């Protein structure tokens, strides 16, 4: 519930309340109490009574106020989060922002509420990158808010576009385009729109992935049908070869410390996961159980990986601690693919 002070349009408070409610419902972790079910409508701590929420089975309650700051349209939004079971206020804050950015302010508040309750960073102000193929001859590289709003078209082509990957600072996107007849990797600056092509010698260049420190891209370069893993330095624009094997090496993914890469290779006769140190180029096989292990990714702590695990025609999402040889399957279905993890 967000109240308003005199001189402020009432719909600002309503919009913030609705935006926060929508955000908190986005991932299915929370349920909201409708306004019609509430026993009271507090806009300050002095009006807040824990009993009114406890009897309704509410765990947390958020209240706030919207105040006008100046004639330029700036607003001061204050908010408080209460833990009903513990009967204490666990979060409060203020944000000054433009009335034209109510939605953005609501996302910041939602992030703080989410982190206070769950201990995880909120991701409501993050963005999506994706490719739209609206008809047979048009491909568009797009970005939008996490809820699909505020879509922007970055690039349009008559040829296929694929594999977008964000830079860590969210200022650039790397992707693959076939606009010149072959698979080619481009890096596009989101602010200026400028595009740089990675000049690799291979016939096919694919699977670009930014390192967490933003200094390099891991990518796959294919010479005469033999894909290998390469590093591309953002600073000096040089390519360094990491793998050199007659088997297929593909699907690179970085460790959180930017020192290692996990990749898929069929060098053993079936797709399995390997890890390589980007400095020493030492390689280590990570998976042995099952006849198919691919699409590996590190957990944020770097101690475990998750991937697609296949055995006897069933493909499931699995996890494995790097310190252990055992695999734990997370899903019970048979055609699972392409796991990824949220920014938090």
Which residue stretches match the model-derived regions?
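Amphipathic beta-strand/beta-sheet edge segments enriched in Tyr/Trp
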Residues: 45-112
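A flexible loop/linker signature enriched in serine peptidases of the S9 family
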Residues: 121, 132-140, 157-159, 176-184, ...
């Amino acid at each position: 519930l967000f109240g308003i002070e005199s001189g402020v349009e009432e719909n600002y408070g309503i919009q913030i309340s609705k935006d926060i409610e929508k955000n908190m419902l986005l991932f299915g972790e929370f349920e909201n109490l409708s306004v019609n079910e509430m026993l009271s409508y507090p806009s300050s701590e002095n009006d807040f009574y824990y009993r009114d929420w406890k009897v309704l089975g509410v765990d947390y309650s958020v209240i706030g106020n919207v105040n006008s700051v100046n004639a330029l349209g700036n607003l001061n939004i204050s908010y408080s989060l209460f833990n009903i079971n513990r009967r204490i206020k666990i979060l409060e804050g203020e944000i000054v922002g433009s009335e034209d950015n109510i939605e953005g302010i609501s996302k910041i508040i939602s992030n703080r509420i989410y982190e206070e309750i769950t201990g995880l960073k909120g991701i409501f102000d993050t963005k999506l990158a994706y490719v739209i193929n609206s008809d047979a001859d048009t491909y568009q590289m797009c970005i939008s808010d996490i809820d699909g709003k505020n879509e922007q078209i970055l690039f349009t082509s008559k040829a296929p576009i694929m594999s977008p990957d964000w830079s860590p600072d969210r200022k650039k996107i790397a992707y693959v385009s076939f606009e010149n007849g072959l698979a080619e990797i481009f890096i596009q600056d989101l602010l200026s729109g400028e595009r740089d092509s990675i000049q690799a010698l291979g016939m096919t260049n694919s699977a670009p992935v930014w390192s967490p420190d933003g200094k390099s891209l891991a990518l796959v370069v294919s010479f005469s049908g033999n894909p290998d893993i390469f590093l591309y330095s953002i600073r000096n624009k040089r390519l360094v070869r990491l793998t050199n094997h007659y088997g297929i090496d593909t699907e690179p993914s970085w460790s959180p410390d930017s020192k290692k890469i996990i990749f898929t290779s069929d060098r053993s006769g079936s797709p399995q996961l390997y890890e390589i140190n980007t400095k020493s180029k030492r390689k280590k096989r990570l998976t042995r159980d099952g006849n198919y292990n691919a699409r590996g990714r590190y957990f944020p702590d770097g101690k475990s990986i998750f991937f697609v695990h296949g055995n006897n025609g069933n493909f499931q999402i699995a996890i494995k601690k790097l310190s252990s040889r055992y695999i734990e399957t997370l899903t019970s279905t048979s055609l699972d693919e392409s796991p990824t993890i949220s920014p938090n």
